[in-house]
């Protein structure tokens, strides 16, 4: 989990990100890997193929529960900053190319805070409004 500067809408001025790294090989087996093998489209395919969005959502629930317990003035919509999946084989340090402002090898998603809260409640056995 990373604590990063947030907006002024939080009591401590920070938001929190779940970060996970992956070493998946997304290129062709008959040629060397390049950062182009880790563009947004391929990352989305890899995420879906491996059910990483579900993993990200569950990690977000865990973070939500921790912050609810430990963060004074906790507000899910302000404090939950989303998830980053770092596909290390596609990242090239400062030379990592950008496509539409997104670095190769980095998948980001900010699940709606209401989804995280509702899933937490559901997993806790509570009724969730339809």
Locate predicted features:
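Structural signature of nuclease core domains in nucleic-acid processing machines
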Residues: 1-130
């Amino acid at each position: 989990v990373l604590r990063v500067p947030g907006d002024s809408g939080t009591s401590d001025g920070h938001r929190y990100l779940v970060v996970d790294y992956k070493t998946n090989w997304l290129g062709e087996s008959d040629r060397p890997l390049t950062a182009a093998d880790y563009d947004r489209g391929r990352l989305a395919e890899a995420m879906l193929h491996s059910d990483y969005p579900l993993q990200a959502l569950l990690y977000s629930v865990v973070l939500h529960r921790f912050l609810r317990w430990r963060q004074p003035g906790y507000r899910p919509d302000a404090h939950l900053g989303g998830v980053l999946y770092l596909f290390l084989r596609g990242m090239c340090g400062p030379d990592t190319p950008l496509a539409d402002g997104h670095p190769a090898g980095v998948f980001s998603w900010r699940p709606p805070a209401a989804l995280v809260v509702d899933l937490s409640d559901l997993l806790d056995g509570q009724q969730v409004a339809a």
